[in-house]
Amino acid sequence: MPEPHAVLYVTNELSHIVKDGFLPIWKLTGDESLNDLWLENGKYATDVYAYGDVSKWTIRQLRGHGFIFISTHKNVQLADIIKTVDVRIPREVARSHDMKAFENEIGRRRIRMRKGFGDALRNYAFKMAIEFHGSEAETLNDANPRLHKIYGMPEIPPLYMEYAEIGTRFDDEPTDEKLVSMLDYIVYSAEEVHYIGCGDLRTLMQFKKRSPGRFRRVLWHVYDPIAPECSDPNVIVHNIMVDSKKDILKHMNFLKRVERLFIWDVSSDRSQMNDHEWETTRFAEDRLGEEIAYEMGGAFSSALIKHRIPNSKDEYHCISTYLFPQPGADADMYELRNFMRLRGYSHVDRHMHPDASVTKVVSRDVRKMVELYHGRDRGRFLKKRLFEHLHIVRKNGLLHESDEPRADLFYLTNRCNMGLEPSIYEVMKKSVIATAWVGRAPLYDYDDFALPRSTVMLNGSYRDIRILDGNGAILFLMWRYPDIVKKDLTYDPAWAMNFAVSLKEPIPDPPVPDISLCRFIGLRVESSVLRVRNPTLHETADELKRMGLDLSGHLYVTLMSGAYVTDLFWWFKMILDWSAQNREQKLRDLKRSAAEVIEWKEQMAERPWHVRNDLIAALREYKRKMGMREGASIDSWLELLRHL
């Protein structure tokens, strides 16, 4: 059966280009009815180019159809908003008539648009959940460390510990300058940072520009004789050399219970020193930083210390939890960072990291880390791994038990969880928001397996849990939470439809057939495909109709095709309660709810769309055909329908 497709809507100045392509082309006149649009879009089994007048349709209606807006201009006028285009085509590409360049531009942008979908779900989760499972750097970037608990199983970065493997080299990309990267991966939950050896504050100001939110939530005590005055109210400059803990203690208020971080990046000038003197000085500076941090371990949650590898020692000792390479460092910079887990108050539970202790270091092993991981052309993924490893609490969400509201985004169907489907459904049942991959097209960028859409629908819907495809979830949040998910959101609806999303939300009252619930693009085509490939699948429905009875073809084809994810509980309530009303009452409920639809049959406006027995007959027939293969309980739905 076909997978979800996108409608690649181009404005008129690009319509000549798409005529040279090989995808279908859909010309819109502006005179189409709701049903015309629904039926025509349902005939396409691949992405399709479209152009013409769409000004009478709202953004939610067009997103419901899978529209992506492409133009050389900034905006497109729709019925309810002026929409910022999703893909802005450079004018030189438009003038060149180069179809490959045009389609590459669309493809590259669509990959970036996936982030908009994930960010929108996370924004909802940040309002509703405390615990986040399966987390990566994207969650850390926007989480509130004083409120949210971030769990996951991130990749472990290269680390030096006694008797442990360093790790193997991996592909990487360039990143920020070394010291900016250092602040980027180490600053997360700390509210007070004591930064010794801050230099001229350029690093701190670059970090402020890169991550203004994280910069603002920290009180910075910076220590360096050359540090200039700073106008930022959360930066306190101390123009001193730090020789002992006394130099820092006098600037700390122990009446405040805050998480503190200690950063030591001290390096004196070489001046006239010979090699031996210079190495001895550097070694002493690094050890002094460790000793001060360790002595003040009750005041700081952790420390990050400069760690220069001596040339003249085969082995030496330091106080450390981990040594690790530096993202953005030059390939010939034989200097690491030393992370020390200390005993001070922390918002993040870092008990899985060992306490800092005296560690023996073998010089050739740590030099190997430099050779494997340093270089100006490297560092981006190393920095991400360090950020995740230091600040994400390592727990498997499938096994975690807690009463806190939780979010489970983009990890449940990782291939490592194959065979654990019952646990996945249990998590979706108790999660505030969860996602699972249901797409059947080949996956090139992710290592996920697909859950069957029909099983997800039958397993995932409860009185207090909505189960929708990803596009339906975004449309639902646009409707119910317009302050969280804005109408102008840029995302790829076809990509989103590859996910099932569960939301701990009640059924809307009244249970209207909003776009988020009812789209079923291509349902008529799916029905025809079933008939021309295997007519026995329709025999029972045909026989019932000949007898003057009915079976909900809508429900039956939805389940048999495996092409849709929508919320059964809400849909049944919509059929039995809302559709049983007359035309006037139906329209009144739609208006009162500010709901929108993309299918409306005027001939059915005064009648129920189905009756209870139609739904029961469809489920029974589905059970008869697929019951042995269906992993979900159909009997429980039959029982529910009898009493709903």
UniProtKB/Swiss-Prot annotation:
Alphabetical keyword list: Capsid protein, Outer capsid protein, Virion
N-terminal signal peptide: none
Secreted as UniProt keyword: no
CDD domains named among the record's database cross-references: capping_2-OMTase_Orbivirus
Cellular compartment(s): Virion
InterPro entries reported in the protein's UniProt record: Orbi_VP4 (IPR007753), Orbi_VP4_C (IPR043026), SAM-dependent_MTases_sf (IPR029063)
Origin superkingdom: Viruses
CC terms in the record's Gene Ontology section: viral outer capsid
Protein name in the entry: Core protein VP4
UniProt gene name: Segment-4
